[in-house]
Amino acid sequence: MTQDSRFPNLFILDHPLIQHKLSHMRDRDTSTRTFRELLREITLLMGYEITRNLPMTTRRLTTPLVEIDAPVIAGKKLAIVPVLRAGIGMSDGLLELVPSARVGHIGVYRAEDHRPVEYLVRLPDLEDRVFILCDPMVATGYSAVHAVDVLKRRNVAGENILFLALVAAPEGVQVFQDAHPDVKLYVASLDSHLNEHAYIVPGLGDAGDRLFGTKN
C-alpha cells in the first residue's frame, strides 16, 4: 500500500495480484464475463487490504482439545454500500470476504454537467457500523462526494466510512479530499487525468457498460 504526497487521505493498493487483474480489466478486448469475474476477484483482494486494521478482541472458546482466548473482530459491524450501477459489481467480492455484512444501495447518475443526480437511497440501520462505499471509478469525484454526503447527513462519522474504487483521476481525488478529508479513499490506481469528456485516462472505459454489456 502506497500514498501520494498530494493526497493524504488516498491509499493506493499496489499488491501484484491487484495490479495484474486491473491490467486485464483495462484491456478493451476483455469480455463482459471476464470483466465481471475480474471485478469480483479484485474487489475481494482490495477488501482484504482495507480491512486489515479492523479492531480485534478475544473470545473464550473451546477447541476439540482445550479452551483458548481466540482473536475475533471487535466492535463495529460492517455495511457494504455500492454506488449504482457499477458499484453492484464490487459487492459480491466484499460479501465473499465478509458474508455477514449488511448491504445498502445509493443510486446516482451523472448529469450532462457531470454533477450527480440521486435517485435511490436504501441503507441498513446506521448505528455502530463501518460503511464501505464502493464504485469502480472516481472521475470528477462528484458522485463519490455525494455518496459520502448521504451517509454524513444521517450522522455517520467520516472515520466510519471507507471508499473503495478501482481507478481514480487526480482531479476527482482532489474534489473528494476537499469535501471529505476525514474519509479514507482506497484505489488500485491513480491514473493520469480526465479527458474533455470527463473520462479517466488511461482508465478502463465505462465500468457499468463493461460490467453489464450495455452501450452508453
From Swiss-Prot:
Binds 1 Mg(2+) ion per subunit. The magnesium is bound as Mg-PRPP. The keyword GTP-binding applies. Keywords: Allosteric enzyme, Glycosyltransferase, GTP-binding, Magnesium, Nucleotide-binding, Transferase. GO terms for biological process: UMP salvage; uracil salvage. Its cofactor is Mg(2+). One of its GO terms (molecular function) is magnesium ion binding. It is an enzyme of class 2 (transferase). It catalyses: UMP + diphosphate = 5-phospho-alpha-D-ribose 1-diphosphate + uracil. SUPFAM superfamilies: PRTase-like. Allosterically activated by GTP. Uracil binds at I200, G205, D206, A207. 5-phospho-alpha-D-ribose 1-diphosphate binds at R85, R110, D135, P136, M137, V138, A139, T140, G141, Y142, S143, D206. Catalyzes the conversion of uracil and 5-phospho-alpha-D-ribose 1-diphosphate (PRPP) to UMP and diphosphate. Belongs to the UPRTase family. This is Uracil phosphoribosyltransferase. It comes from Paraburkholderia xenovorans (strain LB400). The gene is upp.
